[in-house]
Amino acid sequence: MQISDHLHRFLFENTPVRGSIVHLDDSFQQSLQHHDFPQILRQALGELMAASALLAATLKLKGGALVLQVQGKGPLKLLVVECTSDLGIRATAKWSGELDGMSFSDMVSNGHFVITLDPRDGGQPYQGIVPVEGGSIAEILQSYMQRSEQIDTRMWLACDGKRAAGMLVQKMPDQPDAADPDAWNRIIMLADTVRDEELLDLSAVSLIKRLFNEEDVRLFKEQPIKFHCGCSRESVGNMLRMLGEEEVADILAEQHTIDINCDFCNAEYHFDEVDAEQLFTTEIVMPGNDVRH
């Protein structure tokens, strides 16, 4: 049964509890194909990708994107995942030195977790930054949601280096629970019995049946997930414009060409003196906006 690269949302009837289940296969592999990540880093990146899709499905992005970052002070320098409102996802990581045998806490070493909601419509992005608290991706996100958003959220994430999967259960804000006051605790107790191999191997239908067989669960239509990198020559050109004509000229005088590789998809962009001259004699196009001069 094909269960990869889909997200399923579900709702516990007559309770203030909702959830979602995600499976990533091709989208995860495409994020890795241009990088030689160590196994422990592949696992962390896969878990963050699953988490980003789960959170994006609960937010009203309306054409925007959710960006999750773990900024480390240890050997792991950066994990970053971007997930758009239509579940297009991309990810990358930066590290130095040996990671094998290290715990997640040791890799990050007192780093920070950053969540950004980018409306992509010219509006002001929202960004939250908190210290990394917890020994796993799931614990970091649960702590953030509880402390910064005041929303009870639990997350279970798994990655075997080839596939990633996850499940989120969340208590909906401003929803009365008088009809079933024990629902949240009962559902979390059941969800806590899930095993990593079940997250990875079972379809959403089978997993819900296994965990919540006695509950009244409404499962919504699956949503496809795909790898998507939004880089382009135009966006790279706009970035060079922001550096300024003088600095770009200095770089070209030294290197003759400016070569830029996308960290997400490894696309290559090359700019020479003729390209640079065109950059600074044409209008800047801002994504999601009208042309600006």
From Swiss-Prot:
* Cited Pfam families: HSP33
Parts of the chain that traverse the membrane: none
Indicate where this protein resides in the cell.
Cytoplasm
Q: Which UniProt keywords apply?
A: Chaperone, Cytoplasm, Disulfide bond, Redox-active center, Zinc
Question: Which Gene3D superfamilies is this protein grouped with?
Answer: helix hairpin bin, Hsp33 domain, HSP33 redox switch-like
A GO CC term attached to the entry? cytoplasm
Gene Ontology terms describing biological process: protein refolding
MF GO annotations: protein folding chaperone; unfolded protein binding
Q: What does the UniProt record tell us about how this protein is modified after translation?
A: Under oxidizing conditions two disulfide bonds are formed involving the reactive cysteines. Under reducing conditions zinc is bound to the reactive cysteines and the protein is inactive.
Q: Which residues are connected by disulfide bridges in this protein?
A: 229-231, 262-265
**NCBIfam families for the chain:** PRK00114.1
Protein family according to the UniProt entry: Belongs to the HSP33 family.
Task: Note the PANTHER family from the entry.
Answer: 33 KDA CHAPERONIN (PTHR30111:SF1)
What is the recorded function of this protein according to its Swiss-Prot or TrEMBL entry? Redox regulated molecular chaperone. Protects both thermally unfolding and oxidatively damaged proteins from irreversible aggregation. Plays an important role in the bacterial defense system toward oxidative stress.
* Protein name according to UniProt: 33 kDa chaperonin
**Which organism does this sequence originate in?**
Methylobacillus flagellatus (strain ATCC 51484 / DSM 6875 / VKM B-1610 / KT)
